[in-house]
Regions:
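Residues lining hydrophobic/aromatic ligand-binding pockets adjacent to catalytic sites
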Residues: 1-147
Length: 147
């Protein structure tokens, strides 16, 4: 991975998404940092929660890229197909995930504190309706904003 990342043009922002927590090693984060690449925090079936991914990055010395990214894909422990079956027709939030939302807010606050940009995408299969998931995260962020 490190060799591949070093070959990438430097005039673009890159993120690597892994979906196996055993890959979140100090060597992984070192390879990202040496190439100016960030980890794509992902909320996915078999991945560890976002806050544990953030902890793994912090324990390895942090991320040095100038941005963070998170993808909210499915509830933990729920396959893409099962989420699709449970949440269709995606017209409302069907299973709010307070921990996932709080973790995203934590990532956004970290971005602000370190003067980095943050990108967050949500899939309808995360809670049932991605626009409403994003609205809920924005409200949570604003509710807990310092005056």
């Amino acid at each position: 991975l490190a060799e591949f990342l070093q070959q990438l043009p430097r005039d673009f922002q890159y993120a690597v998404e892994v979906r196996n927590s055993e890959l979140l090693t100090p060597a992984y984060f070192k390879a990202l940092n040496e190439a100016g690449v960030t980890h794509c925090f992902n909320h996915w079936n078999s991945m560890i929660p976002l806050h544990l991914q953030m902890r793994a990055a912090a324990d390895a010395g942090g991320l040095t890229a100038d941005f963070f990214i998170a993808r909210l894909l499915t509830p933990l422990g729920t396959s893409y197909q099962n989420a699709e079956e449970q949440f269709a027709p995606y017209d409302k939030v069907q299973r709010p995930n307070s921990q996932m939302r709080a973790d995203v807010v934590k990532l956004l606050r970290r971005a602000l504190a370190t003067n980095k940009r943050a990108f967050v995408t949500a899939n309808n299969k995360a809670e049932g309706n991605s626009p409403l998931t994003m609205v809920s995260i924005a409200k949570l962020f604003l509710e807990n904003a310092a005056p």
